[in-house]
Amino acid sequence: MLAGPDADTIRARQLPGATLANAGAGIKIGIIDDGVDQRHPFFDPSGYTMPAGFPRGRAAYTTAKVIVARAFPPPGAAWKHAGAPYDPEESGHATHVAGIAAGNANTLANGARISGVAPRAYIGNYKALTVPTESGLGLNGNAPEIVAAIEAAVADGMDVINLSLGEPEIEPSRDLVALALDAAAAAGVVPVVAAGNDFEDFGRGSLGSPGSAADAITVGATTSGPSPAIAGFSSSGPTPLSLRLKPDVVAPGTSILSSRPDGWGLSSGTSMAAPHVAGAAALLLQRHPDWAPAQVKAALTVTARPLASADGGAGPTRSGAGLVDVSAADTPLVRPVPTGVSFGLVRADTLSTRSVTVEDAGGGAGAWNVAVELSGAPLGTRISVPPTVSVPGLLVLDLLAGAAEGEVAGAIVLRRDALSRRIPLWGRVEVPKLDVSGARTLVRPGVYAGDTRGRPALVTTYRYPEVPPGGPVTARLAGPEQVFRVRMRRPVANFGVVITQRGPGSRVEPRIVRAGDENRLTGYAALPLGQNPYVDEFGSPVPAAGALRPAPGVYEIVFDSPTAAGAGAFRFRFWMDDVTPPRATVVRRTVRRGDPVRVRVTDAGSGVDVRSIEATVDGKPVRAQLVGDEIRVSTTGLERGRHSLRLSLADYQETRNNENVTRILPNTRTMTSWITVLRP
């Protein structure tokens, strides 16, 4: 086990002239997270001078080391600490992350002396995650709050921002946080983002937003120590909707010792890997203050070290370009644009072409030999490149797809003498099998019937994400499929379906895909699983599937089953643009003890989710049951007199929502009412 942030593995201490006394000096790293504890000894301000124009935000939460302290609570936030830059009850994650990036050099921690990657850098504290979650994930925040934090960090003059946070990707053109990160990069700030920790549950295509941002440096995690390998949890590309090749690089992310509000602790995750790279970016900017964010990203990716594994390579969808090597990134020689190549989905027996502009990054001009090293490709598929490229110049890649399906993965390798530089590449050769010829078009929301019996069984696997066996939803659906079609002629907030009834023996499940292609799921929202981290049902099965903030276009709603024996009849509700919670009205506020309080509920959209119903009387949980269009709240055991009823309920769209919607819990209704209980 290593002590503290693992700067040695990423060769941060091998930079020419680098010492712990000056590493990162003058560079400002913004931590967009759940609030940094500026009082921690890892951020001791002794020996620092507050830079001109600072502090900013809440001065009481700043020091000469932590020079900005801001909070971004959502409108109407009820949590008592939501507006404070540090939450004494819930904050913790940001303090650990900030220590990895920029904790002071040679700080005593659990008997060892540890240092952040860029120990002399300043820290900006941007608390965008301010709301506690019922699912136990800690503080959270939605897109508007995270975007506000990004914009504030840019305005405050941060050089690097670190976001060790994430949510499932939505339609890229409508992803507010990812677009804000691209804008930050355009404004001169280096954005670094954690890749996520979903690989073991969701497999390939599990890397979400805002790591999906094109101009961000997205970071996966390796094990720590002298022989790093990809951490099992580290999320995998491609990004599920945009099909970008991510992550960009990897860095140590297991058992990292760093600061916690109560002292010190070990944590694992891509949340720990990202600040290693944020610190690395700070070191490079200290040495190359004229480098733009794209130059920092290119330097870190083109010089990264490929990782070995049992099958000969970790693969670019897990490792990106490889393990960060800060010393090599100091002299990248060449700068590829883009830094990685995604062919996306390529139909079998077709030709797909991509190009990379290779710029001179200083000392790289002239001829370089070009080769392609593939870690995998389906039979008959090949990638051709010219034997050389003259820098600066254009490098053209042709992917000639064969007849077989499968992923193409590897790297373009540029060589000159003993030097080499790498550009990762990925694509998938596909032969879509879904039969959409008889698909019924749904023209309006409502309740519909279906039956998969007697229909073709052509599709077994849906992607992306490509859920592995043993994941939280069924990985293989080998039964027959029934397909319905939806044409979105305008942008909507959402659409989806929920199975309301299954016939005897029916085990049908919904999936939603784009343009008749089972390889184009609408991301996590397409899976019958609770997606909302603010509620208890997060991660639990739910018979619903949908699309969040989808682009206009054609979508297919597919009902499938694990086996042919699970085919059968079903009924489902289809909704579109559901942004309001159910309505709830108490029928009678005075009842006899033992008789239920009846609350009439209606929902014209996705329908009431029975699992969401929670009731308390005088603050104590009581039984509440949905019967038809009424919720019946038990009065058993209540004393005669006046009582306070609190009822909470949501619809099925709430199970599809995540942090990329503009309000927290927009489809949840919470009502309070006084009730009077009489003698029986």
Task: Please annotate each region the language model reported.
Residues P468-Q531:
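Acidic, Ser/Thr/Pro-rich low-complexity intrinsically disordered segments
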